[in-house]
A protein has these predicted regions:
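Conserved alpha/beta-domain cores
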Residues: 1-215
Length: 216
């Protein structure tokens, strides 16, 4: 599903954000119908990075109760200043171990777990905070050097070691398809993702995420 930025002029009201969300959900439903998939199995995660507090508050009023951020310290500031909203914050970007302490304090979900060093750093900080964290293992199914994530062949060994980190609740895999009009290259990545998915650990649940970004 292709969503160009030009398709989504910046919304200026709760009503406009709600209308944008409805349009995206309709497109998701249509795509699911073509694929023979239940739309309820797809979760839309609006991304609020660089979006100011006023517009985020409008987005929440329009029904966005889970938001994605890839700049950890910016996300923590937002979580603290908007604690009254009850937003579930999902960290979607690559994480350095020295930023694990921030994620452990506020995030409900981390979608880019790709090393045991990060798993250990999160485990230690979550113990101090007495919290748990939902995580997705990031897999580089497109084989692009510019992207983070495990190679599909490394997933099985990696996930077998994750039960040692009991503060991490493994929910599934996260991957980004290659951005190209060449359909077969995209499908090849999908096949690699399917192979990697068969390696998830016993305590994990399958997680399916549609990455689409309506502008808040």
């Amino acid at each position: 599903m292709s969503l160009a930025a030009a398709d989504w002029p910046v919304a200026q009201s709760v009503e406009q954000i709600a209308a944008n969300l409805a349009t995206v959900h309709q497109r998701i439903a249509s795509a699911c119908a073509r694929a023979g998939r239940d739309p309820a199995s797809v979760r839309l995660l609006p991304v609020s990075k660089t979006v100011d507090e006023a517009r985020i508050r409008m987005a929440v009023a329009a029904g966005c109760h889970q938001l994605g951020e890839n700049k950890v310290q910016e996300a923590q500031r937002k979580a603290e200043s908007m604690a009254d909203l009850g937003v579930h914050w999902s960290v979607i970007g690559h994480l350095q171990t020295n930023k694990a302490r921030y994620v452990a304090r506020f995030a409900s979900e981390f979608q880019a777990l790709d090393s045991l060093r990060v798993a250990e750093a999160l485990q230690q900080r979550l113990l101090l905070e007495d919290r748990t964290l939902d995580v997705f293992v990031q897999v580089n199914t497109s084989a692009e050097p510019s992207k983070y994530g495990l190679e599909p062949a490394a997933v099985a060994d990696f996930v077998q070691q994750l039960p040692a980190f009991d503060r991490l609740r493994v929910r599934g895999l996260m991957t980004l398809a290659i951005f190209t009009p060449e359909v077969e290259r995209v499908r090849a990545g999908g096949r690699r993702r399917a192979a990697a998915a068969r390696s998830r650990p016993p305590q994990s649940a399958p997680g399916r995420i549609c990455w689409a970004r309506p502008r808040c």
